[in-house]
C-alpha cells in the first residue's frame, strides 16, 4: 500500500517537474566581426536578457580598448607625453598587463605596441603596394613591448618611446568573450558559448552532453580539419584564411610579423585550445608568427591545452600537448 501511495504521489508531481532548458541564439556586430551567443535557458526572456547584458559588456570593452575609435581610452594614450604616468581604468590596465605578459612569454611574437605598423599595413592593404622604406622604418622604430611600464599600485602606464601606439586587436575579442561568459553565468545562464570571429569561448556543457562540439576549419572550408568536444575552455583559430592580400605577386597575411613590420608571407593557420579566450586569442596569433619552431613554447605556457598548426598542403599536425 505504501508503494502504491508513493507511486501515485510521484505521478502527481510529474507535471510540475522542471522543463528541459531550451537552446537560444543571439547575434550582434562588434569589434569588426560578428559576436554570437548560443545558450541554454528556461525561456527566451531569460536568455535574451542575459545575452543582452553580455553584449553590453563586450561593447564596454570595445569603447575602452579599440584602436579604431579615436576617442577610446586606448587611442588617447598615443598622444600622452613620454615619461608621464597616465592613470588607467581598471579594465584597460588589466588588459595591457595581460598583453605585456604574453608579449614577454612569446618573445614579442605577440606585441600590443604594433599600432604604428598596424595602421601602416591597413593603408598597404588598401593600396596594394608595399610601404616606402622610410615610412616602414619610422613605424618600426615606434614599436616595442618593452618600452612601456605599468605601475600596479598607482594603476598607471608610462610610455618610454616616441610615437607609440597600441593595437589590442589580437587579444580584445578574447578578453571580451571571457567577460561575456562571466556575465551570462552571473545571470543564471552558464551553459553558454560565445563566438567572436575566430575565437570561441565555451561555458558549461549543453544539457545531457559532455561538451560543445567545435569544428576547426582552416584552409579547406568545406570540411572540418577536426571536431573537438569542449566545455569550460576556449579555442581560437588565426592565420592566412580570409584576409590575405597579394602585392607584387606575393601573398601577405593580415597578421603582422613584428620582425619585418609586414604581413606574414608563409601560409599558416594555428588553433590554440586554452583555459580562457584571453589566452587562446593572442597565442593563436603568436603561433602563426613563430611557426613550428614556437609550438612547444606556446604549448608549455600555463593554461594552454593544445596547439595545432596547419598549412594548405599539410595534413593536420599532431598537437604539441
Give the location of each predicted region.
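Mature catalytic core of soluble alpha/beta enzymes
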Residues: 2-321
